[in-house]
Amino acid sequence: MKKIKVIKLRTVCTDKATELPGTLTHWMYNMGGSVDYLFQPKGLNEEGQPVKKLYLEAERLEVGPEDFEEVEVPDEILGTQVTDDASGFTGMAISFMRHVNGCFHVFIQPKGLNKKEGAPIQRNDFDLRGCSGKMISKLSELELKKSEAAVPSPEPATFEREPASEDLPGKHF
């Protein structure tokens, strides 16, 4: 486990570049050790839907020292082979996402190309509690039930799936 300093989720802040106010709903921690935040600007578009989210680094956000917290991430899992037990989806653990409710997902990137499209196989995210791998400690059945009751997992399909080559921090959702 590695301790990292992050901005608390649900923090209301302003993006310095766009000057838009909004709320932090997720953060992602990658293999390089950097953190990006999913920023939901306040407001609705012409169709009455929320304005598209932005991935932003901490330096773009107007926040104070009280908005930070220290959390532990299982850094040792990144770069290792991981499998989602329910689907069998297997690949390298490339990043983590913390949801606003506290649930922790791992992004898995398989090897190879999608034969139909000739593009890298799309990465997918899964609740870490439902995955296995050499560096993942399994919870007992009782621990799992308690954890899921305290921090239920949102559906991984919360985010639009895009080819890995287009799915970079800083991209609008």
Kindly give the residue locations of the regions a language model identified.
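Basic/aromatic-rich interaction segments and small domains that mediate binding to polyanionic partners
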Residues: 2-3, 8, 12-60, 72, ...
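Long, low-complexity intrinsically disordered regions
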Residues: 64-80, 85, 90-99, 129-173
